[in-house]
C-alpha cells in the first residue's frame, strides 16, 4: 500500500504554530527542487515555475536541484537549462543516482563550481533522439530540426564542460556512461561529494 507524500510540520514566518505540509512543499521553501523522473512538459513547467517564483522571492540565495532521472524531452531539458541560466540565483545541481540524457544536460547546466555528483552516481550523455512519420517533406524537416538541436546541445555541452566541440560531437554519437569521477574529469560536474 503506497504511503503517499509524507507531511512535515512547517511554521511560516510570523505564525505562532506550525502547519502540516507535504514534504515537497516544505523543501521548496528551502529552495530544494527535484528532477527525479522522466523530464516531460509537466515536470519541466513545474521546475520552471518554481525557479522563477523562488528567484523573484530572493535572488541572492542558491537553488538546489537534486537529479535522479533517465532524462526525457530535449525541448523540456533545454527550457529548464535556459531558465537556470536566466534567473539571477545560482543553481547548484546534485546527481544522487543517475543523470542520463537530458538530465545530464541539466546537471551540467548548474552554476560553475556548484555541480556535484554523489560518489556512486552514473551520468550518461548521448545525442538527442527524434522520430517522425508522415510525408517525406515532414520527415526531412524533422530530421533537419533534430540535427539543429543536436548541434545546439553539443555547443552547450562544450561550453559547460570545457571539452572541444569535436570530442563532444564524437561522444554524443552513442551512449557514453560515466562514473562520478569520470564526469568530474570530463567537466560535467565540478566535484564528487564525500561524506
Swiss-Prot record:
Which residues act catalytically here? Answer: 101, 126
Q: Which HAMAP family match?
A: ClpP (MF_00444)
Could you say which protein family the record assigns here? Belongs to the peptidase S14 family.
In terms of InterPro entries, this protein maps to: ClpP (IPR001907), ClpP/crotonase-like_dom_sf (IPR029045), ClpP/TepA (IPR023562), ClpP_His_AS (IPR033135), ClpP_Ser_AS (IPR018215)
The answer to whether the entry has keyword Nucleotidyltransferase is no
Q: Where in the cell is it found?
A: Plastid, Chloroplast stroma
The EC number(s) this enzyme carries:
3.4.21.92
- The protein's name is ATP-dependent Clp protease proteolytic subunit
Please classify the protein's predominant subcellular localization into one broad category: plastid
Q: Which UniProt keywords apply?
A: Chloroplast, Hydrolase, Plastid, Protease, Serine protease
Which catalytic reaction applies to this protein?
Hydrolysis of proteins to small peptides in the presence of ATP and magnesium. alpha-casein is the usual test substrate. In the absence of ATP, only oligopeptides shorter than five residues are hydrolyzed (such as succinyl-Leu-Tyr-|-NHMec, and Leu-Tyr-Leu-|-Tyr-Trp, in which cleavage of the -Tyr-|-Leu- and -Tyr-|-Trp bonds also occurs)
Q: Which gene encodes it?
A: clpP
Example GO biological process:
protein quality control for misfolded or incompletely synthesized proteins
What are the GO cellular component annotations? Answer: chloroplast stroma; endopeptidase Clp complex
Fill in the subunit field for this protein: Component of the chloroplastic Clp protease core complex.
NCBIfam families named in the record: PRK00277.1 (NF001368)
User: What are the recorded GO MF terms, alphabetically?
Assistant: ATP-dependent peptidase activity; ATPase binding; serine-type endopeptidase activity
State the function annotated in the UniProt record: Cleaves peptides in various proteins in a process that requires ATP hydrolysis. Has a chymotrypsin-like activity. Plays a major role in the degradation of misfolded proteins.
Amino acid at each position: 500500500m503506497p504511503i503517499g507524500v509524507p507531511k512535515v510540520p512547517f511554521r511560516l514566518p510570523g505564525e505562532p504554530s506550525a502547519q502540516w505540509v507535504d514534504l515537497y512543499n516544505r523543501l521548496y521553501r528551502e529552495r530544494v527542487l527535484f528532477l527525479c523522473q522522466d523530464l516531460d512538459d509537466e515536470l519541466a513547467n513545474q521546475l520552471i515555475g518554481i525557479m522563477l517564483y523562488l528567484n523573484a522571492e530572493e535572488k541572492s540565495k542558491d537553488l538546489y536541484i537534486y537529479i535522479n532521472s533517465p532524462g526525457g524531452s530535449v525541448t523540456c531539458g533545454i527550457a529548464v537549462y535556459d531558465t537556470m541560466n536566466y534567473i539571477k540565483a545560482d543553481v547548484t545541481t546534485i546527481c544522487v543516482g543517475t543523470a542520463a540524457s537530458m538530465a545530464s544536460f541539466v546537471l551540467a547546466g548548474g552554476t560553475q563550481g556548484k555541480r556535484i555528483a554523489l560518489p556512486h552516481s552514473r551520468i550518461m550523455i548521448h545525442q538527442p533522439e527524434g522520430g517522425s512519420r508522415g510525408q517525406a517533406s515532414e520527415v526531412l524537416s524533422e530530421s533537419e530540426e533534430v540535427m539543429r538541436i543536436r548541434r545546439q546541445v553539443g555547443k552547450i555541452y562544450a561550453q559547460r564542460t570545457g571539452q572541444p566541440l569535436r570530442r563532444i560531437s564524437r561522444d554524443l554519437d552513442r551512449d557514453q556512461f560515466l562514473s562520478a569521477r569520470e564526469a568530474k574529469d570530463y567537466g560535467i560536474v565540478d566535484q564528487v561529494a564525500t561524506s
